[in-house]
A protein has these predicted regions:
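Short, surface-exposed beta-strand/loop "edge" segments at domain boundaries and coil↔beta transitions
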Residues: 13, 91-93, 141, 168-170, ...
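Surface-exposed loop/turn motifs in large extracellular/passenger domains
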Residues: 1-6, 13-35, 42-59, 63-78, ...
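A motif-centric signal for short, conserved binding hotspots located
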Residues: 108
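Nucleotide/phosphate-binding loop and acidic/charged catalytic motifs
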Residues: 112
Length: 212
C-alpha cells in the first residue's frame, strides 16, 4: 500500500520482540526517519523483516542486531550512512536478492550473485555469471536444483535458465510448475548414472540445448 511511517528524530520502527517473534512485511509505502544517525527500521532480537517493495530511508535504512532475520527482494533502501547496517556483535541472517540501495550490499547477497550500479548510481543485485550455473526470477544459483527449489517454493510457475553446461541430476517436486530453459550449446547431464531429471510436478523444457 501507500502507508507512510515517519519519525523526525528517532527510529521509525523497532522490531524488538518482547511477546514472541515479531514479523514485519513491507510491500510498499514509506518508512523513514529524519535523523541523520537514526534507523528507519531497527531489526532486533529474533524478529523477521521482509522487504519486497516501498521506500526505506534514514541515517541507516535498515539496522540489524542480535539474531534477526532480514530478507530484501525489492524496494529502495537509502541511508546517509548505509542502506543496511549490522551490529558488530550481531549474528543475524541477511539475504538480499533484489531492490535498489544507496550503498553496496554485496556482503549480503547469496553466492551466485553480486552487485552493480544502475544508471542512477544505485547499487543493484545481478547474477554473477562467473559463479552461477542457473538463474530463476533474476536470481543466480550455484546449483540447478537450488534454482528449481526456489521456483517450487514460490506461489507461481517459473523459469529456470541453465547458464553453462552442468553435470547434475535434478528433481522437480510435486506441485511445482517449472520451465527449464536450456540455451543452444548448453547441456544438462546426469551424475553417477542417475536420471538427469526426475519429474514429479509440471515440467516444460525450452531452448536449443540438450538433456542427456
Amino acid at each position: 500500500g501507500d502507508a507512510v511511517i515517519r519519525s523526525e528524530t528517532n527510529t521509525a520502527i523497532s522490531t524488538q520482540s518482547g511477546y514472541g517473534v515479531v514479523e514485519l512485511n513491507m510491500t510498499g509505502g514509506t518508512i523513514s526517519t529524519g535523523s541523520s544517525t537514526g534507523y528507519a527500521v531497527y531489526a532486533r532480537e529474533k524478529s523477521r523483516v521482509n522487504i519486497g517493495g516501498g521506500n526505506v530511508t534514514g541515517g541507516t535504512a535498515v539496522m540489524v542486531y542480535d539474531s534477526a532475520n532480514v530478507t530484501v527482494t525489492g524496494g529502495t533502501l537509502e541511508g546517509k550512512k548505509a542502506a543496511i547496517g549490522k551490529g558488530s556483535s550481531a549474528t543475524p541472517v541477511i539475504s538480499v536478492t533484489g531492490g535498489k540501495f544507496s550503498s553496496d550490499v554485496k556482503e549480503f547477497v547469496p553466492e551466485g550473485n553480486t552487485t552493480d550500479t544502475d544508471s542512477e548510481g544505485n547499487f543493484i543485485v545481478v547474477v554473477d555469471k562467473a559463479k552461477a550455473v542457473a538463474e530463476a526470477n533474476g536470481v543466480g544459483y550455484t546449483t540447478v536444483q537450488a534454482a528449481i527449489d526456489a521456483v517450487a517454493n514460490s506461489d507461481a510457475a517459473g523459469t529456470v535458465k541453465l547458464l553453462p553446461s552442468k553435470a547434475e541430476s535434478v528433481a522437480v517436486p510435486a506441485g511445482a510448475n517449472v520451465t527449464l530453459d536450456i540455451p543452444a550449446g548448453v547441456t544438462l547431464t546426469n551424475t553417477n548414472g542417475a536420471h538427469t531429471i526426475t519429474n514429479s510436478g509440471q515440467l516444460a523444457i525450452t531452448g536449443e540445448g540438450h538433456v542427456d
